C-alpha cells in the first residue's frame, strides 16, 4: 500500500512537471513573449537612448488600431478630460466662457458657483490669472483652463476688465466642484407639448431628466419631444435609466453579446414617469451609442415615433481597463442589440473607410433623400407590438425622414461662422447693450416675442466679416439672412439668460422639430406608426 501511494505520488509529480514545462514552453513561444523580448532588446541594446514609455504607448495604439474604430488608448491627461463631462462635475471657478480676440469673455457665471459668489459678472474679461497675463497673448484655451482649474478649496487670484470701469478689478476665487449638465434645454414648446434636449448620457443625466420631466408635467405637458440630435452617447446605465422612463415592466431595453461575453439583457422596471404620453424622438447622423440604445428600444416597442435621419451606428461595448500610470485602454468586448435583435454597429472594413462613412452617406444623397437608402431583406426586423418593419445594419433608421436643409447655409454664411465674425459681432452687441436689453426685456418670453436683429446690427456683422477676410457676396448674404438673424438672436438670448433660451430661439429653424410638431397635431398617434408598417 505504501509503495502504491509512493508510486502514485511520483506519477502525479511527473505529470505536474510536464504540465508546467508545457505551460512554460507555450509562454516562451507566445506572441506576448515575443513582444516582451522585442521591447527588452530595444531598451537595452539599441544604439541610441530611447523613450520606453512613448514606444510602448505607440505599440498599444498600433495594436488597438488593428481591431476596430472604438478600441482606443488614452494617456492619463486624456482620461481625465474624457471622464469630466460624463462624471457630471469638475473642480474649477464656475464660468461659461468664450475666447473673443484672444481674451476670455465670461458668458455666464455658473449659478451658485464660486465666481458668482465673489461678484464676477457676465461680460467680464479675465485678463490675468495669478501673475500671468492671459489676454492678447494667443495662449491656448487648454492652457488657460489648466490655470483656472484646480483642487476644491484651493484659491486663484484673477484680474478682470469690466465695461465702464477703468482699472482692472482683483478677485480671489475659491475653487469648488462645478456641475456639468447633460440637458441643454427643457421647455414647453407648444401647448401641452414639452421639449427636452440631452447632449450626452452622463452620471447625472437621469436625475436631470426626471427633474425636467416633472417640471414640464406641472406646466401641463401631455406629449414629449426628446431631442437626441448630435448626442454622441455616454454611459450605458444612463441610457437604460432614460429608456426605463418610457417602457413597461419587463420590456427589454437592450442586450449585449460578445465572444467572451455571454448575452446580457437589460429590462425596464416599469417605474417610469412617462409610460403613456405621446413620444417623439429626434435623431440625426451624429446621434450615437447610448442615443441609439434609447431610440432603438422606443422604436422596437412601438412606444414612440422616431424623426430625423439615420443615426451614426456605434454599437460596440467598450470595457475600460485602467493601467498603473492612470492611462486607460477602452477595449471592445461585445456588441449592442436592440430588443428586436438589430445590431446597432455599422460595418467597419477598415478604419479609414469607417471614418469617411458620413461623407460617403452625404455624397450618395442619403442626407437629402430617403429613397437613396436601401436595405436587403436580411436586415429587416419586426417591432414587438405592431409588427412594423424596422431596419438593422448600422444605426437607427427613423420612422419619418427629415432631409438636411441646405438652402440657408451658403458659403458666405459658413465663412462668417468659421472665421469668428458672427461671434465677434455678437460679443460687440452684448457688450454695448446688455444692461439696456435686460432693462427692456424683463423676461425671456418678452425678448422672444419682441426682439429683432436690426439692420444696423447686420451691417456691423458684414463689416466685421470684411475686417476678418470674409469677402461679401450679396446673393449669398440675402439667402442666409433669415438664419443669420436667428443665430444672432439665439446667441444674445444665451448671453442674457442661458443655453435653454438659446435652444428656444434656434430651434425655430430645426426641421426635425417642425416635423415632430406637425405629426403631434394628428389625433391618431398609433396611426402614425402603422403608416410606416
Predicted region positions:
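PDZ/PDZ-like peptide-tail recognition elements
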Residues: 58, 69-108
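Structural motif
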Residues: 123-125
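Surface-exposed patches in mature extracellular/periplasmic domains of secreted proteins
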Residues: 45-58, 71-76, 224, 254-256, ...
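Bacterial Sec-dependent N-terminal signal peptides
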Residues: 1-28
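Cleft-lining beta-strand/loop regions that shape enzyme active-site pockets
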Residues: 20-31, 35, 39-52, 75, ...
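Residue-level recognition of conserved beta-strand edge/terminus positions
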Residues: 129-130, 161, 332, 347, ...
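Polar, glycine-rich mid-to-C-terminal structural blocks
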Residues: 290, 302, 309, 313-381
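Conserved functional hotspot residues or short segments at active or partner-binding sites
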Residues: 343-344, 348-533
Amino acid at each position: 500500500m505504501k509503495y502504491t501511494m509512493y508510486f502514485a505520488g511520483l506519477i502525479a509529480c511527473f505529470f505536474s512537471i510536464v504540465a508546467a514545462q508545457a505551460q512554460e514552453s507555450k509562454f516562451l513561444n507566445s506572441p506576448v513573449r515575443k513582444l516582451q523580448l522585442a521591447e527588452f532588446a530595444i531598451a537595452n541594446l539599441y544604439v541610441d537612448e530611447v523613450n520606453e514609455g512613448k514606444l510602448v504607448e505607440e505599440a498599444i495604439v498600433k495594436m488597438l488600431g488593428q481591431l476596430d474604430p472604438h478600441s482606443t488608448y488614452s494617456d492619463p491627461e486624456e482620461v481625465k478630460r474624457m471622464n469630466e463631462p460624463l462624471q457630471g462635475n469638475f473642480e474649477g471657478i464656475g464660468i461659461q466662457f468664450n475666447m473673443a480676440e484672444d481674451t476670455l469673455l465670461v458668458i455666464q457665471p455658473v449659478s451658485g458657483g464660486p465666481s458668482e459668489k465673489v461678484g464676477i459678472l457676465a461680460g467680464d474679461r479675465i485678463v490675468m490669472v495669478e501673475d500671468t497675463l492671459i489676454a492678447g497673448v494667443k495662449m491656448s484655451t487648454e492652457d488657460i483652463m489648466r490655470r483656472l482649474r484646480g483642487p476644491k478649496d484651493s484659491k486663484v487670484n484673477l484680474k478682470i476688465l469690466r465695461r465702464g470701469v477703468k482699472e482692472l478689478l482683483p478677485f480671489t476665487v475659491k475653487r469648488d466642484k462645478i456641475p456639468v449638465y447633460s440637458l441643454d434645454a427643457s421647455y414647453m414648446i407648444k401647448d401641452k407639448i414639452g421639449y427636452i434636449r440631452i447632449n450626452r448620457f452622463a452620471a447625472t443625466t437621469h436625475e436631470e431628466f426626471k427633474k425636467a420631466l416633472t417640471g414640464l408635467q406641472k406646466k401641463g405637458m401631455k406629449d414629449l419631444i426628446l431631442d437626441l440630435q448630435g448626442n454622441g452617447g455616454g454611459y450605458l446605465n444612463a441610457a437604460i435609466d432614460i429608456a426605463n422612463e418610457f417602457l413597461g415592466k419587463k420590456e427589454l431595453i437592450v442586450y449585449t453579446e460578445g465572444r467572451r461575453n455571454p448575452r446580457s439583457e437589460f429590462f425596464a422596471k416599469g417605474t417610469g414617469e412617462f409610460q403613456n404620453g405621446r413620444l417623439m424622438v429626434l435623431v440625426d447622423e451624429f446621434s450615437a451609442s447610448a442615443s441609439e440604445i434609447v431610440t432603438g428600444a422606443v422604436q422596437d416597442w412601438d412606444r414612440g415615433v422616431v424623426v430625423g435621419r439615420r443615426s451614426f451606428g456605434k454599437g460596440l461595448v467598450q470595457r475600460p481597463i485602467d493601467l498603473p500610470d492612470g492611462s486607460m485602454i477602452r477595449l471592445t468586448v461585445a456588441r449592442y442589440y436592440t430588443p428586436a435583435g438589430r445590431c446597432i454597429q455599422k460595418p467597419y472594413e477598415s478604419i479609414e473607410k469607417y471614418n469617411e462613412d458620413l461623407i460617403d452617406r452625404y455624397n450618395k444623397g442619403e442626407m437629402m433623400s430617403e429613397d437613396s437608402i436601401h436595405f436587403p431583406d436580411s436586415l429587416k426586423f419586426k417591432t414587438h407590438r405592431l409588427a412594423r418593419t424596422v431596419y438593422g445594419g448600422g444605426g437607427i433608421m427613423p420612422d419619418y425622414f427629415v432631409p438636411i436643409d441646405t438652402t440657408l447655409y451658403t458659403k458666405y454664411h459658413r465663412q462668417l461662422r468659421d472665421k469668428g465674425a458672427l461671434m465677434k459681432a455678437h460679443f460687440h452687441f452684448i457688450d454695448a447693450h446688455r444692461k439696456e436689453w435686460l432693462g427692456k426685456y424683463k423676461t425671456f418670453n418678452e425678448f422672444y416675442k419682441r426682439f429683432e436683429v436690426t439692420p444696423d446690427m447686420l451691417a456691423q456683422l458684414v463689416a466685421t466679416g470684411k475686417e476678418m477676410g470674409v469677402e461679401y457676396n450679396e446673393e449669398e448674404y440675402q439667402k442666409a439672412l433669415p438664419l443669420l438673424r436667428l443665430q444672432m438672436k439665439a446667441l444674445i438670448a444665451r448671453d442674457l439668460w442661458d443655453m435653454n433660451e438659446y435652444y428656444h430661439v434656434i430651434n425655430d429653424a430645426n426641421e426635425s422639430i417642425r416635423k415632430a410638431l406637425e405629426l403631434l397635431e394628428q389625433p391618431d398617434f398609433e396611426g402614425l406608426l402603422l403608416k410606416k408598417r
